[in-house]
Amino acid sequence: MKIHQVHKLVVHNVVNFAEKCLYSPSNQNVMYKPFVYGTSVSGENFTDRVNETTRIKKNFSSGINTILISPRRLGKTSLVKKVISELDGKDPVIVFMDIYDCRSAHDFYLRYSQAILKALSSTAERLMENAKEFLGRLAPRISITPDLTSEYSLSIGVTPKDIDPEEMLNLPERIAEKKGLHIVVCIDEFQQIGEFSDSLTFQKRLRGVWQHQQRTSYCLFGSKKHMMEIIFHS
């Protein structure tokens, strides 16, 4: 996928974080794990990856597209979230989305637009305003409800026949141009697009739109190394 300048970073298992169980000093009958394993981590549980963190931060700040490829459980998601936590979130604006459960291009477009609008909106009112301003032509049915974390979730009711793929894929670029921003869209489990029906057509559409964007860059990462390599070398 040739979209502007692309840096591909293969994440290796630099430090062996094999899961260990030791006796707790306070209670020898209780086992504990010194390392969090099998889920994304942050704070004191995130160790090493200094060079990778620095490089990705520079990519994000410079508008360079980044591809992370490695097997599962080597810390790709934690690495990206670590970088996001160290940036101020204002310039560039970071959008994070996971498409593991997306089963079609339509699912992707909805997840993509929801994540972008939510990242660019500090309140429910602003979320509604941005949705109407930038997706109003599609006449979507928009509902905003508080979720369990006291934040707001956005539901965009648009049928596949109503979607203009190029308009949806250009959403971050249109917002960035209007508001004078730079945006980085991070997409986890990106290899999932290889499972979509007519995946090659969808991939060509992504390339065709994204390669012309000047204020939006992408960080694409996934755990199925073989599928990721097929996508980016096809």
Q: Where are the language model's segments positioned?
A:
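Residue-level signal for alpha-helix termini/capping positions
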Residues: 60-61, 88, 177, 211
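A short, basic N-terminal segment
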Residues: 1-66, 71
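A short, noncatalytic alpha-helical element within ATPase nucleotide-binding/catalytic domains
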Residues: 53, 169-170, 203-204
